[in-house]
């Protein structure tokens, strides 16, 4: 049994089963569980052989915490069917992480080759599906009209850029070794494959890279500096000790420069009534959800509905994600899940950096360098595009991390034949668990009322979103018929105010519930309290402004609704809508407000 488990082909079979499981959840989710169970067979065989079921890594406990918060995120989600698929894609991502980290060094070349194939396949997919006519140019229009027609969904060019960068970096190991080999009679075929493949990947890279060219320049300069420092570390012990810290400092500088530039970019490509649509604006608005759902998270796949319903207050989807990998994780899985994922990424960079200056093998050092570059791209580019935690891309969430851990973990069995976790790994795990626990204990001890208020507000917000967003988007405003279904959420939110009367989350949502009941005086009181605490929250501004309209206080309403460009058109619709609801008085208020917002209509 141990001969089978120790064979390099067993590790590749493990990886193949995990890839099949992930593909099943993407293409045929009805049979996904069956494929996931099959993917666990290598774990069972390792256990029967006397080994641990999976390869131990320094971040195992954090991975476990991340998985637990993902399960909690499924419970909290308003769309259970979408959340069910996503939680299993996360499980597939974790299985991929352990399948990659367990690969022996002999398989590194084949894994790099798979990365090249993925980059090539993604490039072909992009060329066959993207609307090049929309970006102008004769060639783009010609290609869009004459290429083979495929009825596949297009992938955003920013997502393609990130995935190609990561996979191409990891593929470089195979490309480098392949160019030095002789293939005999197959040389011509292999050379054509390499040239055409690299040409296709390079073409797509050029087509998608224009907006971040200055960041790439800084990226290259920083890498050269780090490379020179790593050479010095061979003869200077102090340089070797501080090298991981230098890498993290470089990462911070790169993120700062990147966010000062591309953060102002417009992910929706057009400015409209709902704001600047910049990443900086999305980061600010998304941050409010971190305050609403700090403990459980808002639920898997919840950002689109939350942003539309509670931030811009419209009955249809606007953004599918926050264009920020780490923000999306923290929103959907809470502070604990978000912190766990961030620490995993930073720990991986630290550990790989250590291996670069400590590993004497040039071959393994090169693989570690490539892993480090892929991790840096994942983190920096993940601050601007979320393709690793959105849709089918979720299955690749731990792909760069798993490749990085290949050069970090120790796969040598002990004398008893059982793989044990190195002492250093245990110390890292203990520190990663102890510090957050101490922080939580300190938080509870300092202000228990604040914590209880956060808990009830979080729970009430989850209960409310599960009712209001059950069939979202409907394309229509909710009516008072929904109010009775929100009684449980209302009771929970009132409990939050008993511990902290200024809890913004509870006051905002209680105000929305009172508006549904058409109790506008109570709604105004709650919304005013919330507005005092967070005067820049767009959802609160809009809801309070509308509440003032229904109360007939047009002057106060105008002060707020002047900040909401779409209010003018929506008020015109409300003139008709309130009339159909049997409230001609509110229809008249909407008409008065329309005149204020659009003086030309008078």
Region roles according to the model:
Residues 142-148, 250-291, 308, 457-471:
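Flexible juxtamembrane loops connecting transmembrane helices in multi-pass membrane enzymes
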Residues 2-5, 14-21, 35-44, 71-72, ...:
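Alpha-helical transmembrane segments of multi-pass inner-membrane proteins
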Residues 280-292, 448-513, 522, 529:
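Membrane-interface segments at or immediately adjacent to transmembrane helices
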Residues 280-319, 326, 333-340:
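TM-adjacent membrane-interface loops and short helices in multi-pass inner/ER membrane proteins
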Residues 1-72, 78-82, 92-109, 113-117, ...:
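Transmembrane signal-anchor hairpin modules in multi-pass inner-membrane enzymes, especially those
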Residues 495-496, 529-530, 560-564, 594:
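Canonical positions in the second alpha-helix
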